[in-house]
Amino acid sequence: MEVKAIHRGARISAQKTRLVADQIRGLPIERALNVLAFSPKKAAVIVKKVVESAIANAEHNEGADIDELKVKSIYIDKATSLKRFTARAKGRGNRIEKQTCHITVTLGN
């Protein structure tokens, strides 16, 4: 049994989110939530919400026992960037790209 949760367009870069995802890949659910709860990174809060959503999906849709679940796979994909302009000297402008990512969490036995 596999249960999936996806968060599309998360407002954080994929590179920063992968640092957190690598820490919980393959861990049991309880341990993964503890790691995320005590991580000081912004990405940990976002990833924790996606993991909790996957747990809720497992309970509601599959009737699964959450004590036996673990993080089977978690991967972060780059999403479209939000493009903004900022004013520079002498009438010029520079483009700023605000990065976004897609977070996919799969739970299984």
Curated annotation (Swiss-Prot):
The organism's place on the tree of life at top rank: Bacteria
Keywords: Ribonucleoprotein, Ribosomal protein, RNA-binding, rRNA-binding
GO biological process, one term: translation
UniProt-listed InterPro entries: Ribosomal_uL22 (IPR001063), Ribosomal_uL22_bac/chlpt-type (IPR005727), Ribosomal_uL22_bac/org-type (IPR047867), Ribosomal_uL22_CS (IPR018260), Ribosomal_uL22_sf (IPR036394)
UniProt entry tagged with the keyword Oxidoreductase: no
PROSITE patterns in UniProt: RIBOSOMAL_L22
UniProt family annotation: Belongs to the universal ribosomal protein uL22 family.
Name listed for the protein in its UniProt record: Large ribosomal subunit protein uL22
NCBIfam families recorded: rplV_bact
An annotated GO cellular component: cytosolic large ribosomal subunit
